[in-house]
Amino acid sequence: MVYIQNTHLNDKKQIYQACAQIYGLGHHHCLQICDVLGVSPETRLGMLSTGQHTLLAQIITQNYDTGSDVRRFTRQNIQRLVNIHSYRGYRHIQGLPVRGQRSHGNARTVRKLKNVIKI
């Protein structure tokens, strides 16, 4: 197991799949990271040397927002919508679909399960 950005990554997975488990990194960013490392994306994470592991961690921390930074940024954006009393902020408060989806059908289960934002 490799520990990068507060996430345990499985050694047996390919590099681009393992990196995608870090919150804030998708497959596209993981492929870019593999290009910078000079390693094939299909290479298993366990096959990398310790130097490459440290370089991987360094590339991710310096060039990408991950983990709690992304969560905080998203939370601040939602809170901004709530503070300016926009329609989208109101929908977030109510726990309803924000982007114009129907609320008669599928949103019923979401309304039951979703935690409502408190002001």
From Swiss-Prot:
Family matches, as InterPro entries: Rbsml_uS13_C (IPR027437), Ribosomal_uS13 (IPR001892), Ribosomal_uS13-like_H2TH (IPR010979), Ribosomal_uS13_CS (IPR018269)
Compartmental location: Mitochondrion
Superkingdom of the source species: Eukaryota
SUPFAM superfamilies associated with the record: S13-like H2TH domain (SSF46946)
Principal cellular location given in the protein's record: mitochondrion
Alphabetical keyword list: Mitochondrion, Ribonucleoprotein, Ribosomal protein, RNA-binding, rRNA-binding
GO CC annotation terms, alphabetical: mitochondrion; small ribosomal subunit
MF-aspect GO terms: rRNA binding; structural constituent of ribosome
Gene Ontology biological process: translation
Family: Belongs to the universal ribosomal protein uS13 family.
Protein function: Located at the top of the head of the small subunit, it contacts several helices of the small subunit rRNA.
Subunit structure: Part of the small ribosomal subunit.
The name this protein goes by in its record: Small ribosomal subunit protein uS13m
Native source organism of the sequence: Prototheca wickerhamii
Taxonomic path: Eukaryota, Viridiplantae, Chlorophyta, core chlorophytes, Trebouxiophyceae
